[in-house]
Curated annotation (Swiss-Prot):
GO molecular function: adenine binding; adenine phosphoribosyltransferase activity; AMP binding
Keywords, ordered alphabetically: Cytoplasm, Glycosyltransferase, Purine salvage, Transferase
Name this polypeptide is given: Adenine phosphoribosyltransferase
Pathway in which this enzyme or protein is active: Purine metabolism; AMP biosynthesis via salvage pathway; AMP from adenine: step 1/1
Subunit structure of this chain's protein: Homodimer.
Role noted for this protein: Catalyzes a salvage reaction resulting in the formation of AMP, that is energically less costly than de novo synthesis.
Taxon lineage: Bacteria, Pseudomonadati, Pseudomonadota, Gammaproteobacteria, Enterobacterales
EC nos: 2.4.2.7
Amino acid sequence: MTVSASKTAQQLKYIKDSIKTIPDYPKAGILFRDVTSLLENPKAYSASIKLLSEHYSESGVTKVVGTEARGFLFGAPVALALGVGFVPVRKPGKLPRETISESYELEYGTDTLEIHTDSIQPGDKVLVVDDLLATGGTIEATVKLIRRLGGEVVHAAFIINLPELGGEARLTQQGIHCYSLVSFDGH
């Protein structure tokens, strides 16, 4: 292992160790991965932004899209580091200009996301960023919005992946390359 690879492995371990696990939240049997504990640690937060930015520095990305709300906390600094624009995807009624919307299925019901119609241009190469990848439903809806506006989504980045919930496989089937800093077993 090179010095650089060793340092990266240490940073990834530090990031993972900074994420607290809350058992039985929000309901019994769930192990909740609390990314806010990473945000409280400036060294871990900075390392996560640095590693994501370095990973995509040569990707040709022209926009970074972050999903409400924690995707904003990671997506905006990554966009800034890459020197590209940041685009928020939000719940209905939160964006002031003209929007399009996409509904998606949840475990019990549906939810909807919106994006400004002028925020993505045809041909934009888009990186979608969120804090956590579970089933992939939120990201799938976000990708549909971007593609409807003519953007090309080939990358999605996450701090945490929960592989057992199938989100990465779901997105990979749609041609989206997923990159996560850390993975946790369980859900």
